[in-house]
Every structure is written in C-alpha cells, then in structure tokens.
C-alpha cells in the first residue's frame, strides 16, 4: 500500500503538470487573443469574417473535442503526428482560450465611448496614441472581471488534458481510486480550491487597484 506522503508527492507532481499547462496557455493565449481580436475588427472584410468564423467554431465546440482534433488530425491528414501529449494539449488550450480572450478584448474596446476617440483625434493624436493613452487603461479595467472568470475556468479546464493521456493530477487520482483509495480525489479538489482561491484574491486586489476609473 502506497503511503500517504508518497501519494501526496505524486499528486503534487501531477498538479505541477496542470500548473505548467495553465502558465504556458496564459503566456501564449493572451497575446494570441489580441491578434485574433485585431483580425476580427479589421476593415479588410475577408480577414474579418475568416476570424469571426474561426472564433465561432472554436467557441461552439467542446474543448475536449478540440484536444482530440489537435492530437490526431495532423497525423491522419499530413502524416505528422504530434507525439508529445502535453504539446497537443497546449496547442488546443492556446487556440481555445485565444478565441475567448479575443471576444473579451473586443467587448472591452467597443465599450469605451466613441467620443473619447473622437476627442483624441481633434487634439491631433495618432491612432496608436489614442489607444495607449486613452483607451488601453479603460479597457484593462473593463475586461478584468471577465478575464478573471476565464482564468478560473482555465485552471479547472487543465484537468481535461487527461482525456489524451497527459499525466496530470486528475489522471493520477483516478489511478489511485482504481486501487481502492478515495482520498486522493478529495486531495485533488483541495489543490484546485487553494489555487483558485489564490487567483481570486489576486484579481480582487487588481480590481481594487484600478477602482479609480469608476
């Protein structure tokens, strides 16, 4: 019988895999979301509608399905399979969350009154000056809450990587439960609760720091 300490260490190693997926997804999907957003508001209509269609497809299909597509389709169509399961999971997560973040960005930008942009133009400011000096900080304040919600969802969604055999904490807990041990499942819940709680405190602090925009 595995000892409590040994199992806890193994679960911690599994959760580190979740944290790695979470961190890298944020690192790549936040700027990728900006790129998708700029495409979706582009005045070049083919690019705009291509971007909107792509976002619609990604947001309208389950992340679990997207994981399978990323893992298997390259090998089936191009004979170039993705051999590392973590890499496949990361690609699927980045694509998925970039699309969700792009919609949050777009909503934040569109919520800033047009009059402020027009006032900047009257003052002779360039588009980039208007964006960085007038729009950006207001957008950050407006999108902070929905971004926080997506980040919380991402933390929990990392557990979906186990469906393509990426060995994270949920997969390990299931392996131990198959041996008749139920407590690793509750320990897994505790890992997620602590991390989500920490991120909640962080976003609450950020919202208070930006409350002067109210």
Residue ranges and their predicted role:
Residues 1-214:
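Transmembrane alpha-helices and adjacent helix-loop boundaries
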């Amino acid at each position: 019988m595995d000892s409590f300490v040994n199992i806890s260490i193994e679960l911690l190693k599994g959760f580190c895999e979740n944290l790695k997926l979470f961190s890298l997804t944020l690192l790549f999907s936040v700027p990728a979301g900006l790129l998708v957003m700029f495409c979706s508001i582009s005045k070049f209509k083919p690019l705009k509608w291509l971007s909107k269609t792509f976002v619609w497809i990604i947001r309208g299909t389950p992340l679990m399905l997207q994981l399978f597509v990323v893992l298997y389709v390259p090998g089936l169509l191009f004979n170039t399979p993705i051999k590392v399961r973590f890499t496949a999971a990361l690609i699927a997560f980045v694509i998925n969350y970039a699309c969700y973040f792009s919609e949050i960005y777009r909503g934040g930008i569109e919520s800033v009154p047009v009059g402020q942009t027009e006032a900047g133009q009257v003052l002779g400011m360039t588009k980039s000056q208007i964006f960085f000096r007038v729009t950006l900080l207001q957008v950050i304040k407006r999108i902070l809450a929905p971004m926080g919600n997506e980040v919380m969802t991402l933390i929990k969604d990392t557990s979906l990587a186990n469906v393509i055999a990426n060995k994270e904490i949920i997969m390990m807990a299931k392996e131990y439960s198959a041996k008749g041990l139920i407590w690793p499942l509750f320990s897994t819940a505790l890992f997620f609760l602590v991390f989500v709680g920490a991120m909640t405190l962080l976003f609450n602090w950020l919202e208070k720091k930006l409350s002067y925009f109210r």
